Structures are given as C-alpha cells and as structure tokens.
Amino acid sequence: MAPWKESSPTEARTNHMSVTNPSERLSDVLVEDDPRDGLWALVDSGWADEFLPELPALRLEQDPIHRHKDVLSHTIAVTSQSPARLRVLLAALFHDVGKPHTRSYEHGGVTFRHHEAVGARMARKRMPKLGYEDELTTDVARLVFLSGRFKGYTDGWSDSAVRRYARDGGALLGDLNDLVRSDCTSRNPRRVVALHSALDDLEERISELARDEARKAERPEIGGDRVIAHLEIEPGPVVGQALQFLLDLKRVEGNLGETEVLARLDVWWAERSN
C-alpha cells in the first residue's frame, strides 16, 4: 500500500472545488485576507477553465499600461487590493475580461477600446452560470461597465461631467470609487499617489456639488406670494430678503408650521421697519 501523503493547500482547494457550488467556491477565495494564492489555484488547477474561462483567457494578454504584468496578473493584483466586499471583488475580477475581445492595434500600440462594455456583458452572462443572484450580477456588470469612466479626469472635468459620473454611479458610487482606487498596480509610488489624489479631488467635488444642489433645493415653509399677502407689500427685493430670513430660520430650527412662521415673519418685519 502506498504511504499516505498529506495534500498540499492547492490540492486541498482543488479537491474541495469538485463538491462545492462554483459561486460559493469563488466567493470563498475572494473574501480571503489575501485571495492571490486562491485565485492562482483556481487557474492552475483547471477549475477556472471549466467554470470561469474568462479568467485564464487573460493570461497571455499583455497590458500596455501595466507593462510588467499580463492582464491576468494585473487582475489578480487589483482583486487582492480591493475592499473585502463581494460586489467590489467580483467587479475587480471581471473588470478587464473584455480585453481579449477588443484588442486592436493603432499607431503602433495596442488598444482595448470599449472593453468595459464588452466585459460588463460577459459578466452578466457568466455570473448566473456560476450561481450568483440576479441583483449581484446586475451590480457587478454595472461596475464593470463604469470602471473606465474615471480615465481623463486629470485632463479637466467640468461640473457637469462630475455630476454625470456621480449620477451614473448612483447607489454604486462608493463601490465604483473603491474599484478605481484598486485598479492601480503601478510599481511607481508617485503614480499611485497621483491617482489616489485625483480620486480624492473628484470625491470632494462630488460632495461639494451635492451640498450646493441641496442648498439650492431648499425652500422656506411659505412662498413669496404668501409673504406678499401677509405683509401687504409689493413684489420687490424685500420679498427676497424675507424669504432668505425664513430659509435661515428653517435651517436653524426646522419646520415650525405656518402659524409660527408668520409670527416670526411679523417680528422680523417689525424690527426691519423700525
């Protein structure tokens, strides 16, 4: 009888794969503190060839931006430095799967034009086959589709472009920004710092624009017509001043009800008239 031999970690993983739901197995690997070894095991064992062929297809695809890595190595690096949220981890894993299908040669270089859109369709098709639910699949596909939107920000975005980015991100905006942060595996520390700084700037602009829009959307409890009728005054600058007083009052004390608001307006008007 051959002596018993303890399985290596990779072999143990592979044996477990045969009896585990594909989505459960992949998720188990992704949420590890460092998923790199597990992801390489999925590729090297042949598991990915059977259940996730989009992943090993990246192995020979050279990334013109990250020249020291093929796209598979880059993908695993991005996934390993993503936040430990399954939605973001899956988006990182799928974010470049469209590259082999969009490769073209222009001006002496390689491009992958619209690979995000192609990758989103591929993620939407593959994830249900792995056993993932529709909602998670939709979110991951959306993140993959939007993953390249940040490119060009440092060239100068208008406020409209910033609003569009935030609007397109919607409820996934935080996940999208985390994915963008993770998608920088450069060996040049200055490049990493520059990308994170630019994304910090974008996030601050988004917050500032949201605050501005919220302020513009604010309204006092009563409108200009009610002010004119109550104070028995003509339309003019004083109406705007009264409305600003009432808006400031609402910001400080909240909604008071029309009776109390009119009483405060009377006090303001009396003090102003003296």
Task: Indicate residue ranges for each PLM-predicted region.
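Acidic/His-rich, divalent-metal-binding segments that scaffold phosphate/diphosphate chemistry
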Residues: 11, 15-113
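Amphipathic alpha-helical segments within well-ordered protein domains
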Residues: 27, 79, 124-128, 162-166, ...
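A residue-level signal for conserved active-site and pocket-lining positions in enzyme catalytic cores
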Residues: 38, 42, 78, 144, ...
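Core structural elements
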Residues: 47-49, 148, 233
